[in-house]
Regions:
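C-terminal capping alpha-helices of c-type cytochrome domains
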Residues: 1-19, 439, 454
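Blade-level signature of beta-propeller repeat domains, shared across WD40, Kelch, NHL, RCC1
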Residues: 430-460
Length: 460
């Protein structure tokens, strides 16, 4: 965070240099991503009910597949308000948030609605799970808000739910609100919550909830200070203890080993684990314990980031490994300055520019046993086009760039693309993983869930 302030104070372009600066880089990553011959077969796992009006695409706004840790039961959310439990391969409505949260809204914005969900690792005993959803501005006072002179388009709400019977196929229980945050626009909200799946009882990380908070569109709407001021939470990954009560509102805990808790007189909220993101909408862990976050970029760079406690990942003074001016044209990027090291920014471990795709989605390492060829690979892709990528987890190292490879698909043995399969230019691609480590693909355009079921390697 200090890097952001220093940059804004020091690196303001002079009038004489603005003409040169405004040129920007036209092709920041000239190297192309190549297909290396990996083709993975997909098998349709299930079809979700149409929830969009008049059968318009996307048919079902499905964005996340997760599972209940003890049983492995699969769940999928629909941004329009449904949380499904998969029974015998078919979606059964587990919870309709519209009926439980009367102020719930799923517009405006591509990601507004029931954004994410996560089951507490002790769900089988405590019956607790968590969701994020959107409500109209000023529905209630936000714990994380800003001056009334700045409009709020939506509020994102983090809720804890407690079921009466963890084995039930439909929700019956209670809820309590943990916090809400105002957002300038309907984009880049609180689209990801997750627990560290590697943490065991007694570990520091066990039961701590990670929350990806986007910048809410603040930077592109002219309020870049919301993503740079030290006392703000926009553009960060938070880590909280839902069982604690030492937060300012007394509804959750701030883990004592969070990076900014021990800093005397710090303005930085203790909830912050890492900062400097535009939209950290997918967070995961590799088998060796590395935490990764995909960050959707502005106009040029999509990135995979290796997350470390207290690190700053650059937004809004960096997009990937490139400079941007948050007070100028944020659609331009420039080379790093000679004194870049003084800002202590953690750069992506993998990135592609908009020649390849325009909105990254990730990303999961294959942990299963059914397709040995996929072991040691982290899979991700491009949301709109459905283009598919991977990197080797052995190449993930801070300060270096992992080599991105393209992979392709067949469905039931027939070579195709996701665009062809769902009959839409916009695929709306997302990934999921089950309790056995097998991977899945969700396509919002046609409301389908596919399982990765086989792979072959040919020459690229």
């Amino acid at each position: 965070v200090d890097a952001l302030i220093a940059f804004l104070n020091v690196h303001q372009p002079s009038a004489s240099s603005k003409k040169e600066i405004n040129k920007g880089l036209t092709d920041p990553i000239p190297e192309r991503v190549k297909f290396d011959g990996l083709t993975i077969n997909l098998t349709q796992f299930t079809q979700f009910p149409t929830t969009s009006d008049k059968d318009q695409k996307p048919l079902a706004r499905i964005t996340k597949l997760g599972f209940e840790p003890a049983t492995g039961n699969l769940f999928v959310n629909d941004l329009n308000g449904e949380l499904y439990k998969l029974k015998d391969g078919k979606p059964v409505l587990f919870m309709d948030i519209i009926k439980l949260k009367p102020k719930f809204i799923h517009q405006p914005g591509l990601a507004t609605g029931l954004g994410s969900f996560a089951f507490h690792p002790g769900f089988a005993k405590n019956g607790l799970f968590y969701t994020t959803h959107t409500e109209p501005p000023r529905t209630a006072k936000a714990e994380f808000g800003y001056a009334d002179s700045i409009k709020a388009t939506v509020q994102w709400v983090l809720t804890e739910w407690k079921v009466k019977d963890p084995a039930a196929d439909s929700f019956e229980g209670t809820s309590r609100e943990l916090f809400r945050a105002d957002m300038v626009s309907g984009i880049h909200g609180v689209q990801e919550i997750t627990f560290n799946p590697l943490a065991k009882p007694g570990d520091e990380d066990y039961g701590l909830l990670y929350i990806g908070v986007g910048d809410g569109g603040s930077v592109e709407n002219g309020y870049s200070f919301l993503a740079t001021d030290q006392d703000k939470i926009w553009g960060t990954i938070l880590r909280i203890d839902p069982h604690g009560r030492n937060s300012a509102n007394g509804k959750y805990g701030i883990p004592p080993k969070n990076p900014f808790v021990l800093q005397q007189h710090s303005q930085i909220p203790g909830e912050i684990f890492a900062s400097g993101f535009r939209n950290p909408h997918r967070n995961t862990w590799t088998k060796n314990g590395d935490m990764l976050a995909c960050n959707i970029g502005q106009h040029h760079i999509e990135s995979v980031n290796l997350i470390a406690s207290g690190k700053d990942y650059g937004w809004p003074i960096r997009e990937g490994r490139f400079v941007i001016d948050p007070n100028g044209d944020i659609n331009n990027v420039y080379p790093l300055p000679a004194d870049d090291s003084i800002y202590n920014i953690a750069y992506p471990v993998a990135a592609f520019d908009h020649d390849e795709g325009v909105a990254i989605t990730g990303g999961l390492e294959y942990w299963g046993n059914e397709i040995p060829r996929l072991k040691g690979k982290y899979f991700f892709g491009d949301i709109p086009s459905g283009r598919l990528f991977y990197i080797s987890t052995a190449d993930i190292q801070q300060g270096k760039q992992a080599d991105i490879k393209e992979w392709r698909i067949s469905i039931n043995g027939v070579s195709t693309t996701l665009r062809e399969a769902c009959g839409s230019k916009r695929v709306d691609l997302h990934f999921g993983r089950d309790a056995k480590g097998e991977l899945y693909i969700l396509t919002k355009a046609d409301g389908k869930l596919y399982k990765l079921t086989g792979a072959e390697q040919t020459k690229g």
